[in-house]
Amino acid sequence: MSALLGILGVVLDARFGEPQGWHPLVAFGRLADRLERRFNRSRLAGEADPGVGWRSHGVTAWVLAVLPLTLLAWALAELPYLGWLVQALALYAALGLRSLGEHAEPVALALRAGDLDEARRRVGYLVSRDTRELDQAGVARAATESVLENGSDAVYAALFWFAVAGAPGVVLYRLSNTLDAMWGYRNARFERFGWAAAKIDDILNYLPARLVALTYALLGDTRQALRCWREQAPQWDSPNAGPVMAAGAGALGVFLGGAAIYHGELHQRPLLGSGPQPQGRDIYRALALVRQGVLLWLLVLAGLWAMGWLHA
């Protein structure tokens, strides 16, 4: 991995954001839909029966979706003269730091203006829960949770896998993460077919998530963040989101989690963090935490490069 190319990828994302009009992941999403229609038997059966929707079909679909593009990224990254450009563009396409701010900041602005309906509408672009009945604290909580968790998935984990394996690493991660978002549901349609996508995403996010939790702790209320991570994260249903959100909530000094409505059903989630309910300004604080953490990671990468541990 080139530390300088990693910095270049982050700069490109900060300057240009997501590609306008066309994004590689949009085309990949269409491919994933076609593969799911072809291989997911439980899509037709409408039930997670042992006789249909075998996990092996999900594994096959995952391999067909991810491995050819990962190998293509590896081959292109090895090209003389053009390989460096492929590396930087691969990271740029995988990052979502600027996009995260572009989606979260309007929520905070609407809350500041007292426009709760607009805040609910805006936060609906960030989260999958039902936002129609959220009060101001509920909107701020949903947005803050999304910033902390998506900061891990869409920013830090991409940087991690780019640091480990360059363009093929970040392509492998980003495509796997996208398939988890599309197939990783615990329902009749996807419970068997999406099992591989969900498990692979858990594996790929295991180390990055814990580095992110440590980053949040170092940049916020360290003692409280570490305590929340240790005591509260095991209660969360996701092995990777738990440490990230617990440490992030502790670092910010707010409460996250609690009751939320998903697809018409009330879910009682564990409470994370310590302190008051979040407000609109805490959305900005969460964004600042994510951005400061990215700068810290880039400084660490630059330091490793200066010591000769990473090539230029």
Curated annotation (Swiss-Prot):
GO terms for cellular component: plasma membrane. Pathway: Cofactor biosynthesis; adenosylcobalamin biosynthesis. It is found in: Cell membrane. The chain crosses the membrane at residues 59-79, 81-101, 153-173, 241-261, 292-312. The keyword Protein biosynthesis does not apply. The keyword GTP-binding does not apply. InterPro entries: Cobalamin_biosynth_CobD/CbiB. One of its GO terms (biological process) is cobalamin biosynthetic process. Keywords: Cell membrane, Cobalamin biosynthesis, Membrane, Porphyrin biosynthesis, Transmembrane, Transmembrane helix. It is a multi-pass membrane protein. Belongs to the CobD/CbiB family. Converts cobyric acid to cobinamide by the addition of aminopropanol on the F carboxylic group. This is Cobalamin biosynthesis protein CobD. It comes from Pseudomonas aeruginosa (strain ATCC 15692 / DSM 22644 / CIP 104116 / JCM 14847 / LMG 12228 / 1C / PRS 101 / PAO1).
